[in-house]
A protein has these predicted regions:
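Core segments of cupin and vicinal oxygen chelate
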Residues: 2, 9-49
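Vicinal oxygen chelate
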Residues: 4-13, 31-32, 41, 57-116
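Short amphipathic alpha-helices in soluble, non-transmembrane regions
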Residues: 21-25, 79-84
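Short beta-strand micro-motifs enriched in acidic
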Residues: 30, 55-57
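Short loop/turn positions at the edges of beta-strands in beta-sheet-rich folds
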Residues: 36, 46, 71, 106-108
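Extracellular/periplasmic catalytic domains that process cell-envelope and extracellular macromolecules
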Residues: 46, 60, 95
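Short, charged/polar, Gly/Pro-enriched secondary-structure boundary elements
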Residues: 47-52, 108-112
Length: 116
């Protein structure tokens, strides 16, 4: 079952400037991952808040890279495939974050994920 938005992955030109700006808005740093990922995860205070994973663009795409939904069952991927969703990755472990993700794009090219 898909239960909520888990995280929003954003790519930025200047990581520390983005972190500083979001800190002023009220988000708090909850984790930094080492290079080469070099991401900073931030959330608003309180329980069950969406995580913003801010990552350097390294000269590439800037903006929202994908939005991830929290899933409770690995079978969620199969259920969506039966409905016509084509996944680019399935049940891939991201070592730096400990998340297992399955990624797909919609007809407009926007990136989406399921994560545990």
């Amino acid at each position: 079952m898909i239960t909520r938005v888990d995280h929003i992955d954003m790519r930025v030109a200047d990581l520390e400037t983005a972190v500083e700006t979001l800190s002023k808005v009220g988000l708090e740093v909850v984790r930094r991952t080492p290079a080469p990922r070099s991401s900073v995860e931030m959330r608003l205070p309180g329980e069950n808040q969406v995580t913003f994973e801010i990552r350097p663009s390294n000269g590439g795409f800037e903006g929202v890279h994908h939005i991830a939904f929290r899933q409770t069952e690995p079978e969620d991927v199969e259920r969506l495939k039966e409905k016509g969703i084509e996944f680019k990755t399935e049940h891939m472990l991201i070592k730096d974050t400990g998340r297992t993700v399955s990624s797909f794009s919609d007809a407009n090219g926007s990136g989406w994920q399921l994560t545990d």
